[in-house]
Amino acid sequence: AGGSVTTGIQNTLIGGLAGDALTDADYNVAIGYNALSADTLGSTSTAIGISALSVQNFTTATNSFNTAVGYTAGGSVSTGQYNTLIGGSAGDSLTTGASNTAVGYAALATEDAHGQNTAIGSRALYTLNAGADSYNVAVGNDAGYLMTTGTRNTIIGGLAGDAITTGAKNVAVGTSAMSTNILGSRSVAVGDSALATQNSATAVDMYNTAVGHGAGSAVTTGIQNTIVGGLAGDALTDGDANTALGYTAMSAVVTGDG
């Protein structure tokens, strides 16, 4: 451990090959076999776990502020900075992505070069690999699980938004909220199973708002609906521009436009 350190200060290196290439880098913590083993000049990194941050390597003096805790957590990070990765395999495909937070087993496991994502929960944002900084927030087991290039989505709850692939600017809060939506964008679902079956076969701005337990839970391709109340509009499928306010409001309406 630390076999190459020359003038570096205040490094804590514990484990075979931990911090083994560091020379004059400072303020690093590497605990575990092969943790932070390739970096030479990067400072202010914390790597705890076998092969955590194992390929990170700054060739000029740089404060990385990366934190990786868990087996292979951040194991592919090369020059990405300001990442917090906690959990086995969390963020383990990240290379140059920056300012990501992944907490949970395999959270944000596929994203490589982009940043500004927050994934909290086992396999949250598991398949995300956006083409640019994407500003997604997913909290809950499998939240946003299938998202690939979606951007600016806020997803909170187990299985919430877990079918979204390229949809953007959606808000889904509650277990199974918006759970089958794939391509639809700009919808808000707050409540257990709200907009649970919304699913557009093409990329489209849907502008549905559903607030309440089961609100709009049968909506599939309907757009521009505003549904507020427990079980409100829960039979509506493809109607457009409807407004339902109150418990079970419009609960018998299946189709029809406002």
Regions picked out by a protein language model, each given a short descriptive name:
Residues 1-258:
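Glycine- and small/polar-enriched repetitive beta-structure motifs of secreted/surface proteins
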